[in-house]
């Protein structure tokens, strides 16, 4: 669920997840033993009850009389200030600004492919290896200079293309139609072809491995959601540092960094961080609408709401990995609520996790509570929901401004017929034209979302957290809200839907339309960075 669940790692080669996209489509009871008949049985009326009979009246559970191990105040303190692992000893007694980027990245997590790699093979690598959930593109195998990326947003856009829900500009219609036809026929599509029809992406930001964290936190606090780390004096990439990694680093080593640690006990409402402009989707809407919405608006996750705008779940672009089999395509017609149940089922079977991830906080949540949830769920954002005052004896809860649910761009109805010619081979996937039954799901109107969470009132992203950390440390990151406003302004003149995939986290928490990255490029100028070509 979230920008949030890593793909399961497996040893050895496994079939590509997109390979199947090109293929067709009471427990037992125990009976009591028979009663023994004795020659001289006493009168049943004078029979003394057996031990078993006397125990038929189930005694009360010991838990009913057991004293709680934690008082209410102690439990609240635990929620407000969750414990951490204690941090890495090598960072103790160090100023975080002296930590080098090379100390935080793992070269073994860098995955390269070339532009002639098929989308199918790239997807297989992406799903198998998990974090940092991105594949770097290079021109040849003998270089480690990255010129592009492929991530789950690209995969989402590709699937929408194949099923006929991508709508390019007029000059790209022919290219999109040809790619969609190849995808439905099971023909390999190189990443180079996907790159040709895509928009310009968030610029690739490259920092030397000797750069300190002040440089990275300024970039992240301005809205960029990942940076590449290269060997000093070269373009050879040795690591990828993400917003989530940096937030996790500060959280686990909080005791070592007092200027950041003093922020954790404060309440969200007092810090005044986040945005009240949120893009969301109703739980009764089809999953295809949610995926198209994320693609059109350039966001990586959406809150799923009931009829009263209460948060009842979360859908992330990473969850699109569950749709890479042709047998999963009917899910596109199912409701978002049903897809959430599929996500939870997959977590239980593959990850062995029975917990229900919680992606919301309230204005009275501490920053520590919020960051702990972001790290635990590996999410890029937490939805803020209305909540009553934490103490009935305190002042009444102030009127909380509800979230501004921005109307999204029009969603294309699911196609009723095949787009393009009928696939030429017998293993071609069944298109969405089929009228196969969709698994029934409970309606959003029947769910009491208020008891699950609360009414959506805003969102807090990793960008907001890192921007706060940067300011508290005396740095001057650019205001991510300005990039959000610029994005909304540019969207009014552009409704283009395309393969724009490496989007900025500074705009992923709000509902602005996808626009130019020129404003974000200005934001990172002067920070001593190197840029690569960001198209992929």
Curated annotation (Swiss-Prot):
Q: Where do Basic and acidic residues bias regions lie?
A: 1-13
Q: Which keywords belong to this entry?
A: CBS domain, Cytoplasm, Nucleus, Repeat
> Is the keyword Protein transport in the record?
no
Output the Gene Ontology cellular-component terms.
cytoplasm; nucleus
> Which residue windows does the record flag with biased composition (Polar residues)?
57-71
Localization of this protein: Cytoplasm; Nucleus
All copies of the CBS domain together span: 105-170, 198-256, 274-331, 335-391
MF annotations from Gene Ontology: protein serine/threonine phosphatase inhibitor activity
Which stretches are annotated as coiled coil? none
| Name of protein | Protein SDS23
């Amino acid at each position: 669920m979230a920008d949030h669940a890593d793909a399961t790692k497996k040893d050895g080669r496994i079939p590509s997840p997109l390979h199947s996209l090109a293929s067709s489509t009471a427990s037992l009871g125990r009976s009591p033993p028979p009663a023994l008949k004795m020659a001289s049985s006493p009168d049943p009326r004078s029979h003394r009850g057996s031990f078993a009979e006397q125990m038929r009246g189930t005694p009360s559970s010991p838990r009913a009389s057991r004293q709680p191990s934690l008082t209410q105040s102690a439990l609240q303190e635990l929620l407000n200030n969750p414990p951490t692992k204690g941090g890495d000893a090598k960072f103790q007694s160090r100023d975080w600004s002296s930590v080098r980027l090379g100390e935080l990245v793992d070269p073994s997590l860098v995955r390269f492919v070339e532009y002639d790699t098929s989308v199918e093979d790239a997807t297989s690598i992406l799903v198998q290896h998990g974090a940092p959930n991105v594949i770097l593109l290079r021109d040849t195998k003998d270089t480690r200079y990255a010129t592009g990326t492929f991530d789950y947003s690209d995969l989402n856009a590709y699937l929408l293309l194949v099923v006929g829900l991508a709508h390019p500009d007029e000059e790209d219609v022919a290219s999109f139609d040809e790619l969609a036809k190849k995808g439905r026929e099971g023909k390999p599509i190189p990443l180079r072809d996907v790159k040709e029809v895509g928009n310009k992406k968030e610029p690739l930001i490259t920092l030397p491995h000797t750069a300190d964290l002040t440089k990275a936190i300024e970039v992240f606090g301005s809205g960029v959601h990942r940076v590449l780390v290269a060997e000093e004096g070269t373009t050879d990439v040795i690591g990828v540092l993400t917003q989530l990694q940096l937030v996790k680093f500060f959280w686990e080593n909080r005791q070592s960094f007092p200027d950041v640690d003093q922020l954790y006990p404060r309440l969200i409402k007092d810090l005044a961080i986040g945005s009240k402009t949120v893009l969301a989707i109703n739980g009764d809407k089809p999953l295809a609408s949610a995926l198209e919405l994320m693609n059109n608006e350039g966001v990586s996750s959406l809150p799923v709401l009931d009829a009263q705008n209460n948060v009842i779940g979360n859908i992330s672009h990473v969850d699109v990995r569950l749709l890479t089999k042709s047998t999963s395509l009917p899910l596109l017609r199912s409701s978002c609520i049903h897809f959430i149940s599929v996500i939870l089922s997959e977590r239980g079977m593959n990850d062995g996790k029975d917990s229900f991830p919680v992606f919301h906080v309230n204005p009275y949540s501490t920053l520590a509570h919020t960051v702990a949830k972001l790290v635990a769920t590996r999410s890029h954002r937490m939805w803020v929901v209305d909540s009553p005052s934490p103490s009935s004896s305190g002042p009444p809860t102030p009127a909380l401004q509800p979230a501004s649910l921005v109307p999204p761009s029009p969603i294309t109805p699911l196609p009723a017929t095949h787009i393009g010619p009928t696939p030429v081979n017998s293993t071609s996937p069944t298109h969405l034209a089929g009228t196969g039954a969709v698994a029934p799901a409970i309606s959003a109107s029947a769910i009491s979302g208020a008891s699950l969470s609360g009414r959506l009132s805003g969102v807090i992203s990793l960008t907001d957290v890192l921007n706060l950390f940067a300011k508290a440390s005396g740095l001057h990151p650019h205001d991510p809200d300005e990039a959000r406003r610029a994005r909304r302004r540019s969207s009014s003149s552009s409704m283009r839907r395309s393969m724009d995939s490496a989007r900025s986290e500074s705009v992923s928490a709000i509902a602005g339309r996808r626009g130019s990255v020129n404003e974000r490029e200005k934001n990172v100028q002067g920070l001593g960075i190197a840029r690569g070509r960001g198209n992929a």
